[in-house]
């Protein structure tokens, strides 16, 4: 089943909380992430039926308060799960990392990895202390990770993707940063 995701970035934290309360009172949504981000902004990521996401985005389209908004449709359920929590793993042999220019494309990259490869999303970091950038950490065989990165490079521009890396056979102390 596919979902839609809405992303709102408010220029003021207090104003953001007030808007989120309004959205929750008027629409059926699930909160995926809510973070204060640099410099003094509030990032809100939620999932909902496509019609609700579209209606929420319409409300902010004409807003003159410099609220950044975007939506992504057709997101896999596994990607939604990855947005709201880390994947718990005991061990892995290879790690792929994609650094993305913004939150919207971070979600699209994670979804593309899940839909086009046998890799698993380990963790998605967005916005927090990253000035809007995102990181997707994913695991799989070296060949799956390379194929996923090739697919990402084929589907995104160099302006959208900051960098990609593959870490093969990381040491155990490094793995502990990701394993639970």
Question: Model-found features: residue ranges?
Answer:
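The feature marks the first
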Residues: 1-40, 44-47, 107
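Short, low-order "capping/linker" segments at domain edges
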Residues: 79-96, 173-180
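Surface-exposed interaction/gating patches
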Residues: 91-127, 132-141
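Short amphipathic alpha-helices in soluble, non-transmembrane regions
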Residues: 55-63, 148-155
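Conserved short beta-strand edge segments in small beta-sheet-based binding/regulatory domains
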Residues: 64-77, 158-169
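C-terminal binding/interaction regions
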Residues: 25-30, 44, 122, 128-131, ...
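Short glycine-/aliphatic-rich beta-strand segments at the starts of folded cytosolic domains
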Residues: 1-11, 88-101
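Short amphipathic beta-strand starts and helix->beta connectors
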Residues: 22-32, 82, 115-124
């Amino acid at each position: 089943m596919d979902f839609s995701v809405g992303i709102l970035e408010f220029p003021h934290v207090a104003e953001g909380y007030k808007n989120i309360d309004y959205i929750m009172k008027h629409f059926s949504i699930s909160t995926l992430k809510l973070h204060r981000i640099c410099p003094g902004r509030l990032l809100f990521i939620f999932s909902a039926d496509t019609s609700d996401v579209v209606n929420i985005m319409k409300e902010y389209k004409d807003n003159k308060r410099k609220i950044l908004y975007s939506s992504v449709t057709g997101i896999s359920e596994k990607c939604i799960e990855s947005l709201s929590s880390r994947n718990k793993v005991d061990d892995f042999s290879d790690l792929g990392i994609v650094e993305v220019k913004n939150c919207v494309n971070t979600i699209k990259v994670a979804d593309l990895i899940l839909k086009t490869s046998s890799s698993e999303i380990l963790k998605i970091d967005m916005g927090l202390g990253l000035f809007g950038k995102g990181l997707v950490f994913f695991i799989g065989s070296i060949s799956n990770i390379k194929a996923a990165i090739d697919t990402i490079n084929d589907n995104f521009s160099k302006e959208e993707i900051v960098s990609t890396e593959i870490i093969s056979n990381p040491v155990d102390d490094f793995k502990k940063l990701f394993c639970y």
